[in-house]
Amino acid sequence: MFNRFNKLQAALALVLYSQSALGQYYTSSSIASNSSTAVSSTSSGSVSISSSIELTSSTSDVSSSLTELTSSFTEVSSSIAPSTSSSEVSSSITSSGSSVSGSSSITSSGSSVSSSSPYDERFNSLDLSVHVSAGFSAGVSVGLEPSATTASVTTTLSPYDERVNLIELGVYVSDMRAHLVEYLLFQAAHSTEPHPTEIAAAFLDHGDFTTRLTGISGDEVTRMITGVPWYSTRLKPAISEALAKDGIYTAIPTSTSTTSDTYISSSSPSQVTSSAEPTTVSGVTSSVEPTRSSQVTSSAEPTTVSEITSSAEPLSSSKATTSAESISSNQITISSELIVSSVITSSSEIPSSIEVLTSSGISSSVEPTSLVGPSSDESISSTESLSATSTPLAVSSTVVTSSTDSVSPNIPFSEISSSPESSTAITSGSSSATESGSSVSGSTSATESGSSASGSSSATESGSSVSGSTSATESGSASSVPSSSGSVTESGSSSSASESSITQSGTASGSSVSSTSGSVTQSGSSVSGSSASSAPGISSSIPQSTSSASTASGSITSGTLTSITSGSSSATESGSSVSGSSSATESGSSVSGSTSATESGSSVSGSTSATESGSSASGSSSATESGSSVSGSTSATESGSSVSGSTSATESGSSASGSSSATESGSASSVPSSSGSVTESGSSSSASESSITQSGTASGSSASSTSGSVTQSGSSVSGSSASSAPGISSSIPQSTSSASTASGSITSGTLTSITSGSSSATESGSSASGSSSATESGSSVSGSTSATESGSSVSGSTSATESGSSASGSSSATESGSSVSGSTSATESGSSASGSSSATESGSASSVPSSSGSVTESGSSSSASESSITQSGTASGSSASSTSGSVTQSGSSVSGSSASSTSGSVTQSGSSVSGSSASSAPGISSSIPQSTSSASTASGSITSGTLTSITSSASSASATASNSLSSSDGTIYLPTTTISGDLTLTGKVIATEGVVVAAGAKLTLLDGDKYSFSADLKVYGDLLVKKSKETYPGTEFDISGENFDVTGNFNAEESAATSASIYSFTPSSFDNSGDISLSLSKSKKGEVTFSPYSNSGAFSFSNAILNGGSVSGLQRRDDTEGSVNNGEINLDNGSTYVIVEPVSGKGTVNIISGNLYLHYPDTFTGQTVVFKGEGVLAVDPTESNTTPIPVVGYTGENQIAITADVTALSYDSATGVLTATQGNSQFSFSIGTGFSSSGFNVSEGTFAGAYAYYLNYGGVVASSATPSSTSTTSGATNSTSGSTSFGASVTGSTASTSFGASVTGSTASTLISGSPSVYTTTLTYATTTSTVVVSCSETTDSNGNVYTITTTVPCSSTTATITSCDETGCHVTTSTGTVATETVSSKSYTTVTVTHCDNNGCNTKTVTSEAPEATTTTVSPKTYTTATVTQCDDNGCSTKTVTSECPEETSATTTSPKSYTTVTVTHCDDNGCNTKTVTSEAPEATTTTVSPKTYTTATVTQCDDNGCSTKTVTSECPEETSATTTSPKSYTTVTVTHCDDNGCNTKTVTSEAPEATTTTVSPKTYTTATVTQCDDNGCSTKTVTSEAPKETSETSETSAAPKTYTTATVTQCDDNGCNVKIITSQIPEATSTVTATSASPKSYTTVTSEGSKATSLTTAISKASSAISTYSKSAAPIKTSTGIIVQSEGIAAGLNANTLNALVGIFVLAFFN
């Protein structure tokens, strides 16, 4: 850790600070690093913005998301709240309002400085704003309140200021109280990291404890606070809030001195313009809020219009940075360049996402340079086939030129996602076309590299040119491209991006994959295609469809396509539709003009996507027209073989019959799919169109089909927006959502006016034809849009059938109104999409998995075709065409197109243009938004909401081949998702939007170590958590959203986990009517925490500790906040359910093999406890339960325990109610009739680490007993089942030979009639077996040893008790005194009988221990001492006998056996006399020069009105070592007696006396001061010990003084009497190295809080223990306390406040040392 000076110096050179959590340090970036980020924001008006990004270093994973919202506001407040993670940095910037000028720009770069102090980082990440003046205009300030003109006052303090430390420590101690269990578990795993004793004092003080926290160094504060795993999730926000509440602003000072200053700054909205370009930390005002752990992105909300708040997160040096541009409304041009000057390492992924929402009419022209390849200034349109280098992921940061859209490259994993918002103004012409290689002529459509396309709008194809159809564009052959992992991009070749958005990922095989398609669509003036364009995978930026795009015919509002003239071949549509052309794209050979796309050998035709809206598209591309069909010319031609006149695409290899949508490259099959993303592996997934997404499916290279995007709704160009490339693009957003209303009435997204005519998709009414969806890899798809087939063509029919009207075999589709023959994809009449769209299949294209699953139909959605189609993946063998699935469209929507996108998300309900929106590429895109969501209601009936659910349908969203998805970085991000099939997600999963597992579907979460669902999780089918490995860590599963609803099955199986499983179910609403089954870690029981629930199904837990009702600690909830159980809760394999909150209903808790712990039995109502095996029902004596708790199956072997001394026990044979009395409280249990009242007794044991009193039964249960006592022969299974040792109390002493261990199957073989029955069992010792009498009472001691208590039954003359065991057997003495078996043995046993009596009679316990043997060897045998402790009250005396092993002594000669002395203590009161006998070991004579170990015995007696309680504690004396025989250590005994009206209280404390010393250095000494304070309630006396000044010596000795101890007595009195505490602390040893005199150090007063009255728990404290300790600031803390805390399987997590107070002293000792 840096020293303070270094940390302060480092702060001036760092833009970002490192954060530490549990020892994990993240590196921070320094300014000197190679990567940089520029964010520029322009205010409204006509402004030009330029931003550049240079990536000069190899990068690791950088995921950033920048979102800027520009609106009519004049200012933008931007806040950057990046999160940091060890492996990735994802940042998100949001700007709302209008943009703020450059002031918001931030640079963050630099290589990270490792090992920066976690302290600096903590504050930096927390609420630390580095306040600087440089680089900002005078009017800019940071941290202002939302009001634009409001002035704020803050006090600036150093992070090291004691006031800041006190606030932090206050939060820390409060959090410790609220989450006691977590701190206990954490401390157990970090026992070497002690806490300052001040924390202990503050923890114990429930008042104003802050004064106890002074004096703790800043470094110590840092270690404690940042060292816990919940620092960033709980402590950080709480500390930030606490500092803010006190008006404290923290900053790293320039010197080590701590200063504070106050300043007031304000700014007005109009002055927040500045174009500062900060290059150092001082130029940035940041309010950083780093998030913890990897891959967490946070997006900060702008706080006000008037201020610039930027919060920057460090990007690690290895990460690339992003650039964000914000444009406000009005006319703004954006020019952006992305220069990648170095190859991104193959392993790296650079996801970035920029979203800009702008209002009307902005035209932007983007000039992105090639991604992975060399940088260049040429516009993306001119680049086609870049040779990408090996970098697996080509990142196109290009801002797609889409009209308003800004670019939003976002690459969540390996994929690049784009999520532009609806764009408004797109200029036609340039945008769509782009091709590397040759330029496109003015025509809108893309041109292709290779040869240029003539003026016709449509794209040209490289290799051969495509005739005029816009859509098509494709580079030569694509096949070779390997896939980049999830992401869309292709490795191998670069993707040129034909369209602006196209961005081609390298996918095209060698050349670009891209499908121009998207761009194709054209509405009157706008080139939708372009926006759609996005290239396959890559496209991150992609944006919008042209929605607002232009007004055609002037009269048309943006987005409206109505007046478009067919004009350009591809896109033209009369009326509003976009021509199909866009969809088409071709690789390898050219596609003929037809939209649908044709595929040449390998490429997928883009045509698919195209759809037509409104009127038919002109003959040009695919489109057919409703009414009349387009002649063959329209359709594509195919290289390889051409398809005859049918509109639809033709396919090379085999041709598809005319369906436009289909396109496929013959060869394409090879492409492997990339898992996660939709994309295809090998080939790119061009997926040009949004939905299409088709991942790489297209043949090798262009897997993509433009199709999807194509569809057009009346007004918006869906295709374009959809565009996003397949897999990749996740973010993609909207299709023209904003788009506009077409025909006035039509909202964007609506397809209402589309005429079927166009080949690819046309839908009558509103839907787009299926074409878009289809795309195929491998071979061409048959005529029907949807279908495509690899290998051989599928006939149009394939895709399927459509409800409403069926598609003819030809293209599949029929058209409502008039049908287009084979013409491409089918069109759908009214509501249904023709099967085609959904269908797509690649015959051969096995690799392509289908996304299908995801598909779902929106409400009405086209008939089955969709759904069924979804099958898609199933379809021909492998291909996943999935398009279908998503495709479905409800009546109005364009199914085909939308379907197109693989991703299920696509579907859109009527109004929205699903295709486009769906767009997002398949699986990937998690972020994806909605397509048009805002869009509009088309047909009013469907709202964007529909999309949502459909969207993503998991499958599509994540599906890859085999319907499984994994991510290269191990994390899968889910968008809003509905899973309707079987889907497997491998690795960590994070879902920040709603996830639904539909009925009949199954989601399998495989091998992930963490799952987080922070939005709704609804399980109507099956959700399974599984592991495929033999060893794995426990899973962290967190559900914290609004709703957690289970009607199906939620099952987790991980019993072999090597660490504790942690499941947290804390949603706002938790409802289970299905089956939730958790089988968690065995080695350390799993932990389950949940908020109040409503259960009408079943909860089944195995190996779990459950804490219900409170997430923030063991606090009782209000009655209105409890849970309702009307189902079953099953506890098995040691599971313990700790219930703190009220539970009502009419449910059942089945204890199969576990424990139920009730803290408030009176609030446990309507529930029945059923014993189905061994277990414990434990109750805290907090309040009487007015209604008996029904208990079924009680036999005495399964037990009921009260965690306080039971003074009386009674049984009502008429009602079957067993009642235990404790003081004034009663606890009743309805166990049923048939029991004998004389068979009940109470025994002491432990539960959850504390003493408990067990209600036992040893009598006969009548055969007529009620169901509550169904076991006919209680004890039939005998308590001493094999493992239990009869004489367990002997514990380790006879370990290997202990007869107890050899108890053989105990079966109740004998019942003694006529009197309370006892049970006999057979014990085997050596070679002899004996039958003895035992009870069924089994308990556990503080060490976790299980033993059986043997008892006698006074009223039976035939009852016998074990007296001894030896090689001849275990012997009993009958009531007549005769010995049943003669004892012949070298070993002997002693028996101690302890009897406790009350009004119901006496309870006798017999404990057998091995007696010491005489020995003639030179080594004495092990011996044992027995101490008897008796406690008496009005009800009688309770005696306990404890046996401990004596140490062995070693001697060269035979020594005499050890001897013992016995002391008898008698106390008498009105009830009689109580006599105690204590045996202690007497000193042995020794002939050696080493004295043997000795023990001292201290007797402590406490008296009150009920009598006296005496305890005897034996402790080992330390050995002494000397060259000569020295006198043994001696001890002094102090007796303290305090008397009041109630009598006297006497305590005896023994402390070790100082030893003689031969050193010349005196030990440290301490002074003791007694402070007494009195008030009306009495006097309170405190004793404070402080260190005295050290003595110095100029000499140095070789030996040190022995340890000495001081004793402090503290007495506190109140109306109830006085409480005296005696504390012994160790005096530190003197050191012989002292050579200089030092001043007396500061002394501190330590105050102990009131502890509970002495109880038997104090026996758990050995040696000197105390909560009081001294702590010198000039030296390391001196530990003076020790302690023990006993837990049983973590059950202590359930101790309530009352029980916890009794253990707090022990806890403090254990936790803080």
Curated annotation (Swiss-Prot):
Sites where a glycan is attached: 34, 1133, 1241, 1278
Cellular location(s): Secreted, Cell wall; Membrane
Post-translational modification: The GPI-anchor is attached to the protein in the endoplasmic reticulum and serves to target the protein to the cell surface. There, the glucosamine-inositol phospholipid moiety is cleaved off and the GPI-modified mannoprotein is covalently attached via its lipidless GPI glycan remnant to the 1,6-beta-glucan of the outer cell wall layer.
GO molecular function (one): structural constituent of cell wall
Uses, biotech or industry: Responsible for the thick foam layer formation on the sake mash during the fermentation process.
Keyword terms of this UniProt record: Cell wall, Cell wall biogenesis/degradation, Glycoprotein, GPI-anchor, Lipoprotein, Membrane, Secreted, Signal
Comp. bias regions, Polar residues: 276-327, 359-368
Primary location recorded for the protein, binned into one broad class: secreted
Biased composition (Low complexity): 256-275, 374-939
Matching PROSITE patterns: SRP1_TIP1
Signal peptide: 1-23
Propeptide: 1693-1713
GPI-anchor amidated alanine-type lipidated residues: 1692
Matches recorded under InterPro entries: SRP1_TIP1, Yeast_SRP1/TIP1_CWP
Topological category with respect to the lipid bilayer: Lipid-anchor; GPI-anchor
UniProt record, GO biological process: fungal-type cell wall organization
Pfam families: SRP1_TIP1
Region (Disordered): 80-117, 256-327, 359-939, 1582-1603
Single GO cellular component term: side of membrane
Family membership: Belongs to the SRP1/TIP1 family.
Record function comment: Involved in cell wall organization and biosynthesis. Confers cell surface hydrophobicity (CSH).
Note: 'Awa' means 'foam' in Japanese.
Protein name as it appears in the record: Cell wall protein AWA1
Lineage of origin: Eukaryota, Fungi, Dikarya, Ascomycota, Saccharomycotina
